[in-house]
Amino acid sequence: MSKDWEEKFRPEDLQRIRGFRLMDDDFMSKCFEENIECTEMVLQIVLGRDDLKVEKVAIQHQLKNLQGRSIIFDIYATDHAGKRYNVEIQRADRGAGAKRARYHSSLIDANVTEPGEKLENLVETYVIFITEHDVLGKGKPIYHIDRVIKETGENFGDEAHILYVNGEYRDESPIGTLMHDFSCTNAKDIKYRTLSERVRYFKEDEKGVAAMCKAMEDMRDEAALAARLAERKEVASRLLKKGAMSFEEIAEISQLSVEEVRALAGKRGA
C-alpha cells in the first residue's frame, strides 16, 4: 500500500529505492553516512573483534597520491587506536583486483604520515573489499591477505592487511548472516537490527526517502555535468588536432578555460 507522502517524489525514484540493497555502493554510502554504529558492527563481524570501537567514519572520502591523482573510498574509518579501515563495495569483479587493493593500501599510508614522522609509527591499516561474487573462487567466506616471508612462512608484520569478503557466502554464522543482509531489498528481511533500521529509514520513512531522492538527483546532475565536460573536451581535442587555432580561440569555442585547453594539449604531446 502506497503512502500519501510518496506522491511528492518521482515514481521512478521510488521504484529504484525499493530495489536498492546494501550491496549497491550508492545506497550503502547513504546508509553508513555519519553512522558509526553500522560501520562498527560491520568491521566487528568481518574482523571477528568485539573490542573494535570506531571513532570516525567518512563516506565517499577522497585521498590523493603525491602526483595529485585522487581516488574515492566508499567508507574510510578510524578506530580508538588510530587504525584505519577502508571498506569498498564491489559488484563488478574487475573492480576488486589485487592491484587496486594494493593501491588503496598505499594511499592510506601516504595520507596518514606527516613530514619527518618516523615510519615505524605507521598505523595498522585494513583494506576490505566486500564483493558481490566470490572473486577469488575458493568458496571461503573471507580471504585474509598479508605479506609473509616465503622461506619461513612467517608473517612479515608490516600491519597492512587486505581482506576480501565473499558476498555469495551464506550460512548461520555472523559473516553469512551479514552477507544475506547486504543482499536484501526489504528491511524486514534483514536480520541485524542495526542494519534493518537504517535500511527501513531510507526506504520507508518520508525524511529518509527524501534524502535518497535528493542524493539521486545530485548524482544525475553530476553525471550530466560530467557528460557536458566530456563533450567540450572532445571538441577541444578535435580542434587541437587540426592545429589551426590558438588556445584562446579553442577555449572560446569549446567553452573550456584556456588552462584546460593547455592541459589537453600537454596530454596530446606527452
What kind of region is each of these model predictions?
Residues 129-132, 166-167, 203:
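Pocket-edge structural micro-motifs
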Residues 2-18, 78, 85-90, 176-270:
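Short, charged alpha-helical interaction segments and adjacent helix-coil junctions
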Residues 149-158, 163-168, 178-185:
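Low-complexity, glycine/alanine/valine/leucine- and proline-rich hydrophobic stretches
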Residues 1-158, 171:
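Accessory alpha/beta interaction modules
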